[in-house]
Amino acid sequence: MDNDKHLKGTTTVGIVCTDGVVLATEQRATMGHFIASKTAKKIYQIDDLVGMTTAGSVGDAQQIVRIISVESKLFKMRRQESITIKGITTLLSNMLSGQRYYPLMVQLLIGGVDKNGPAIYSLDALGGNIEETRAVSTGSGSPMAYGVLEDRYTEDMTVVEGVDLAIRALHNAMKRDSASGENIDVVVITKDKYERLDPEAVMKKRELLN
């Protein structure tokens, strides 16, 4: 049996900013009350300027990443342009909806920058999707994260400010949610680049919150 199928628990955050988007997750994966991994990857690059966060079953999430990454590359080869974030979301929504009788146990955030500007979409396990215009959180620690996001988010926020807010939201969620913990992984996407922040720089920002 594939143990990845049973690795669960997470908190993810997505923030829409004026100049891009910020995606962030903690890195703990659990099997019941057991901490199965302290370095679980939960942010995946889907296209040049598109990322996806995953909450739920790691095995299901990795299957989705493999499929949608290939679909994105095929679209670019055929059309000579990148698929839009809305297009990726529609593909994922159809895939998840098609599995509704044997659902893939995931919550996803798709975020990035395309010709229409910065955008983030959230998807549930049955394929329902919502365009998020502000800040969003998924996973077991999301109630705690939302408390910070709702209090501190502003519509004129830049990605620099968004990074600080995402780290603060996850830092607080990890204090109360046993399925969330360890390090924080942060990705910043602007019209120019997809960048994963240095873990040491993220840790220094967390130390200022203690």
Curated annotation (Swiss-Prot):
Catalytic activity, EC: 3.4.25.1
Active site (record annotation): T10
InterPro entries in alphabetical order: Ntn_hydrolases_N, Pept_T1A_Psome_bsu_arc, Pept_T1A_subB, Proteasome_bsu_CS, Proteasome_sua/b, Proteasome_suB-type
Swiss-Prot/TrEMBL catalytic activity: Cleavage of peptide bonds with very broad specificity
Residue span(s) of the pro-peptide: 1-9
Activity control note: The formation of the proteasomal ATPase PAN-20S proteasome complex, via the docking of the C-termini of PAN into the intersubunit pockets in the alpha-rings, triggers opening of the gate for substrate entry. Interconversion between the open-gate and close-gate conformations leads to a dynamic regulation of the 20S proteasome proteolysis activity.
HAMAP family attached to this UniProt entry: Proteasome_B_A
Annotated family: Belongs to the peptidase T1B family.
Quaternary assembly: The 20S proteasome core is composed of 14 alpha and 14 beta subunits that assemble into four stacked heptameric rings, resulting in a barrel-shaped structure. The two inner rings, each composed of seven catalytic beta subunits, are sandwiched by two outer rings, each composed of seven alpha subunits. The catalytic chamber with the active sites is on the inside of the barrel. Has a gated structure, the ends of the cylinder being occluded by the N-termini of the alpha-subunits. Is capped at one or both ends by the proteasome regulatory ATPase, PAN.
Protein name per UniProt: Proteasome subunit beta
Species classification: Archaea, Methanobacteriati, Methanobacteriota, Stenosarchaea group, Methanomicrobia
The encoding gene: psmB
